[in-house]
Design a protein with these regions (language model features):
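C-terminal alpha-helical cap/extension of soluble enzyme domains
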Residues: 117-123, 127-133, 148-151, 157-161, ...
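Alpha-helix-loop-beta-strand connector modules within alpha/beta enzyme cores
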Residues: 51-85, 107-115, 144-148, 195-219
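N-terminal amphipathic alpha-helix/helix-capping segment at the start of soluble metabolic enzymes
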Residues: 1-20, 134-149, 206, 212-213
Length: 249
């Protein structure tokens, strides 16, 4: 395992740059490394990532010094553990609506004594290689502490219920921070299809302000990201517009 590259960038006094994937594409990870991205994020809630693909994504990204974070499909502990066992070093839990749900998220991501993460035998625990665990970390307990230090745990606040229960969510010790979900949040506030509605914008600002006051991160405090859809719909569209009337000869 490598040091969390997002946290490493933060130690340098800067936000990490993150390239987001919605489906497995190893060549994109290599190109992301070539242009200087710090980390990779995969969207397991709306994307499609078989377990074997997550293994490969982490393997390639880590080889270039980039950590991989993920939004998981759901917040069940077994589901989160499948991602962590592949080598994921940051988890965003979608639709966290209560303090109990935030606590369960943190517990699933962090080893005891900070949490209740199950010990596996995959990449995420150095294949349970006792020699490596002893030499690099001073044993399993040392690895567990190292892993917890290098884990980012984020609750996605995208429902009015979560906003109502925000104080309880922010009180969870193992939670690193919160992020938003403008479309679903707007919908829960009665404004479907209006992610930029003033009420949603104000609600998200309130969430992030209170998170920072509680010692957590909010929104894009520690990283800034872009995905292939934004690149294609932005830069690629500009390219087509600039060249679609080019003449032959």
């Amino acid at each position: 395992m490598i040091e969390n590259s997002i946290l490493a960038a933060n130690k340098e006094g800067r936000k990490a740059t993150v390239f987001a994937l919605a489906h497995p594409a190893l060549y994109m990870i290599e190109m992301a490394a070539h242009v200087g991205f710090d980390a990779i994020n995969i969207d397991g809630e709306h994307g499609g990532f078989p377990e074997e693909a997550i293994d490969d994504i982490c393997r390639v990204a880590n080889g270039y010094g980039m950590s991989v974070t993920a939004r998981v499909p759901d917040n069940a502990a077994y589901q989160i553990n499948l991602y962590l066992d592949r080598g994921i070093q940051g988890v965003t839990g979608p639709h966290i609506n209560s303090g109990a749900e935030a606590q369960a998220l943190a517990d699933a991501c962090l080893f005891p004594v900070d949490g209740k993460r199950s010990w596996g035998g995959g990449r995420g625990t150095e294949f349970n290689d006792q020699t490596i665990l002893d030499e690099k970390y001073g044993g399993k307990l040392g690895f567990a502490k190292w892993s917890n230090t290098n884990m980012i745990v984020v609750a996605q606040i995208e429902d009015k219920k979560a906003w109502d229960n925000l104080d309880d969510i922010l009180a969870v010790p193992g939670l690193s921070g919160v992020t938003g979900g403008p479309h679903d949040f707007a919908q829960s506030l009665g404004h479907p299809g209006e992610p930029d509605h003033p009420e949603r914008v104000a609600a998200t600002l309130d969430v992030e302000t209170r998170a920072r006051a509680a010692g957590k991160t909010g929104g894009g405090d520690i990283s800034t990201g872009i995905g292939i859809a934004e690149l294609m719909l932005g830069e690629a569209r500009a390219f087509v517009a600039a060249h679609k009337n080019d003449k032959l000869g």
